[in-house]
Design a protein with these regions (language model features):
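A short glycine-rich, Lys/Arg-flanked "PGG" loop and its adjoining helix->strand segment in the class I
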Residues: 52-69
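Conserved S-adenosyl-L-methionine
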Residues: 109-120
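Glycine-rich adenosine-cofactor-binding loop
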Residues: 179-195
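Hydrophobic adenine-recognition pocket in adenosine-nucleotide-binding enzymes
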Residues: 44
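A conserved beta-strand element that flanks and buttresses the S-adenosyl-L-methionine
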Residues: 37-40
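Short, glycine-/aromatic-enriched active-site segment of Class I SAM-dependent methyltransferases
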Residues: 68-93, 97-100, 104
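Class I SAM-dependent methyltransferase SAM/SAH-binding core
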Residues: 1-27, 195
Length: 195
């Protein structure tokens, strides 16, 4: 929650509830506004401790054949592209498509489409529908198949990734040390992009 932006939004006619989404907020929204045809969420789920409660609440807020489109960080891209700097202390989790599809199915969603984009180093965008037993599309099956191929030797990739991070750190240390030895003045400034 962010009090000032919520106040500004409400003053400008954008109905904003300045609370974390939970069952109480879900009940309040449903009582005040009813159910929805479409709900969207973009790169906020990594900050949520209880994803099950949020996804169930979202499911319950949708009309019988409503849609939910959400975006989450894609851990495959984080590893593949060495984007260790996209990992922040506020992020509680990172995702792969296959376990998300299984998780969504248990709640009652059918996944219609999965795509990747370059947002935040690589994100998954998933479109699902509040309707059980919709046949999984060729596109979703192909995405899951390709992800599965990438996951072969996953533990080796994680270990390689750790070595790559340490290599980057050591290269930076050597560079700074060399500049100091050359008589250069070295200054550092750190500012996380999302904290």
């Amino acid at each position: 929650p962010a009090k000032l932006p919520a106040e500004i939004a409400n003053k400008n006619g954008i109905n904003t509830i300045n609370k974390f989404f939970d069952i109480n907020v879900k009940n309040f929204i449903e009582k005040k506004y009813g159910k929805f045809d479409f709900i969207t969420s973009h790169n906020v789920l990594a900050h949520i401790e209880n994803n099950l409660e949020v996804f169930k609440g979202t499911y319950e807020l949708l009309n019988d054949k409503g849609y939910f489109c959400f975006e989450v960080g894609y851990f495959v891209k984080v590893i593949k592209n060495n984007y260790f700097d996209t990992i922040y202390h506020e992020h509680l989790d990172y995702h792969h498509a296959k376990p998300l599809v299984s998780f969504l199915k248990k709640i009652g969603f059918s996944v219609l489409f999965i795509t990747q984009n370059k947002i935040q180093g690589g994100s998954l965008r998933i479109l699902c529908r509040k309707q059980r037993n919709i046949k999984i599309s060729k596109q979703v099956n192909k995405f899951l198949f390709n992800e599965n191929k990438l996951m072969i030797n996953y533990s080796k990739k994680i270990m390689f990734w750790e070595r790559k991070i340490n290599e980057n750190l050591n290269n930076l240390k050597r560079y700074i040390k060399q500049k100091k030895m050359d008589g250069r003045i070295v200054a550092g400034y750190g500012a996380p992009t999302k904290a």
